[in-house]
């Protein structure tokens, strides 16, 4: 099970975070800080897996961003690493070459992709095509609702 996902830059600025286990706000802040310190203190030559408490930290760096999943220590690290890779590929397609600014200014879309990808800490959909199809359907529905709202306002 994935307990939480973080995305942050080298300056320890969190750009995306989602917790799938119950934590108090204080525990979330502490866990986030500890995980960021663990990841940022490691050399790029080291393995992308770190034991932390009773969990395993699995991370991957893409440009200036670190994508981190904290999982049970019994989970397969390579599958988790592949999940991170898939998530970033889908973000790359949705945003057209993902960058940190996309996560800052269009964080709703990033969370939408994440919600299509993971559900309650488990991989919901592994197919990039299905994730993209669901996102396109949701955006199409959102646009049609917006058009209907505008029509209602102007023609009532």
Swiss-Prot record:
<keyword id="KW-0968">Cytoplasmic vesicle</keyword>
<dbReference type="GO" id="GO:0015031">
    <property type="term" value="P:protein transport"/>
</dbReference>
<dbReference type="Pfam" id="PF01217">
    <property type="entry name" value="Clat_adaptor_s"/>
</dbReference>
<dbReference type="GO" id="GO:0043231">
    <property type="term" value="C:intracellular membrane-bounded organelle"/>
</dbReference>
<protein>
    <recommendedName>
        <fullName>AP-1 complex subunit sigma-1</fullName>
    </recommendedName>
</protein>
<comment type="similarity">
    <text>Belongs to the adaptor complexes small subunit family.</text>
</comment>
<dbReference type="GO" id="GO:0016192">
    <property type="term" value="P:vesicle-mediated transport"/>
</dbReference>
<comment type="function">
    <text>Subunit of clathrin-associated adaptor protein complex 1 that plays a role in protein sorting in the trans-Golgi network (TGN) and endosomes. The AP complexes mediate the recruitment of clathrin to membranes and the recognition of sorting signals within the cytosolic tails of transmembrane cargo molecules. Also involved in early steps of phagocytosis and macropinocytosis.</text>
</comment>
<keyword id="KW-0653">Protein transport</keyword>
<keyword id="KW-0813">Transport</keyword>
<dbReference type="InterPro" id="IPR044733">
    <property type="entry name" value="AP1_sigma"/>
</dbReference>
<keyword id="KW-0333">Golgi apparatus</keyword>
<dbReference type="InterPro" id="IPR022775">
    <property type="entry name" value="AP_mu_sigma_su"/>
</dbReference>
<dbReference type="GO" id="GO:0035615">
    <property type="term" value="F:clathrin adaptor activity"/>
</dbReference>
<dbReference type="GO" id="GO:0030121">
    <property type="term" value="C:AP-1 adaptor complex"/>
</dbReference>
<comment type="subunit">
    <text>Adaptor protein complex 1 (AP-1) is a heterotetramer composed of two large adaptins (gamma-type subunit and beta-type subunit), a medium adaptin (mu-type subunit) and a small adaptin (sigma-type subunit).</text>
</comment>
<dbReference type="InterPro" id="IPR011012">
    <property type="entry name" value="Longin-like_dom_sf"/>
</dbReference>
<dbReference type="InterPro" id="IPR016635">
    <property type="entry name" value="AP_complex_ssu"/>
</dbReference>
<keyword id="KW-0472">Membrane</keyword>
């Amino acid at each position: 099970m994935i307990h939480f996902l973080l995305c942050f830059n080298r300056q320890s600025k969190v750009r995306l975070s989602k917790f799938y286990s119950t934590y108090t706000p204080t525990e979330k802040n502490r866990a986030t800080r500890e995980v960021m310190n663990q990841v940022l203190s490691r050399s790029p030559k080291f393995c992308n897996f770190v034991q932390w408490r009773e969990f395993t930290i699995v991370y991957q760096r893409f440009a200036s961003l670190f994508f981190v999943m904290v999982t049970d220590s019994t989970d397969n690290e390579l599958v988790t690493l592949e999940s991170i890779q898939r998530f970033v590929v889908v973000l790359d397609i949705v945003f057209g070459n993902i960058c940190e600014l996309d996560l800052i200014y269009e964080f709703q879309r990033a969370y939408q992709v994440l919600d299509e990808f993971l559900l309650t800490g488990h991989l919901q959909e592994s197919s990039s095509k299905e994730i993209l199809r669901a996102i396109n359907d949701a955006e199409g529905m959102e646009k049609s609702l917006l058009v209907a709202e505008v029509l209602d306002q102007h023609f009532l």
